[in-house]
């Protein structure tokens, strides 16, 4: 149900295009930092020339999606997609095609305003404290993303002290994802930053695996109707439109990427010493949170000749890093910060994301 669809032109004019909308697509991805989408318009007023639409407009959009159980129609209803207070940003006009004598069909691609602000701002300052708090500071800072959207955070277990050297805001947040450990899920280092229609999320893959099922998808006949001949929107929403089979496992590639095992060699500049950290996929598997029934993707049985599993070869992937002793610093009785935290994040995170 389309409740509101209004274009705000660069000149400040509001144009209601609800009656012209043919299709609206919204895309969410836990590996994408912002929501994106497109809207297909059947235009009888030639808005591209008359408004004009130039790819810099704002889009107010409010949609109500089908629900599993009835709810009160209010602002907190999870079935409502609301971009009225925080309009979307139109950034591209796709090919304009004629339809009949007086209509044009074209699509407008859009994303959230945070994606636009990320392109025009850079972070150059130092931060210290909880990574989750630093993410929120970057999100709310008027010089950076200046976001008013909700931010859902999974608490982090470590403290960091970092300098962001002229990076785009999302790049700074991505770095925080790479050095953070979860406080709730076995210090999992699998943090992601992404956006849904409900807000932004800074949480680990392990935390996502603990969530309840939100919707069960089934295969239905597309655009099926009920007894009254009406299209059942809820069934169409739950319908599986396409199924594809992922490529078969590539063992050599996975070994070279550090999926099964790896070695991190750390050079301590202060003590002039080297220390190795070996990652073993089979030994670490139980520390991660998995979906129901998950089991290791490699055999636990040792090779008959070498008496080793694929996880017993840490030299297949080598990482090198430098560090310095905390004795160089003084802050109270204990130095609580970690510069990069790589020994607790890099290898386990690398393997987790490959899974």
Language-model-detected regions and their locations in the chain:
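Short beta-strand-centered interaction patches in the first periplasmic/extracellular domains
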Residues: 105-108, 114, 151-252, 256-258
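Short secondary-structure capping/junction motifs at helix and strand boundaries
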Residues: 70-72, 80-82, 145-150, 185-190
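An acidic/polar, Gly/Ser/Thr-rich interaction patch typically located in mid-to-C-terminal regions
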Residues: 25-52, 223-355
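Short, intrinsically disordered, mixed-charge
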Residues: 55, 140, 178-182
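Assembly/oligomerization scaffold segments
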Residues: 1-120
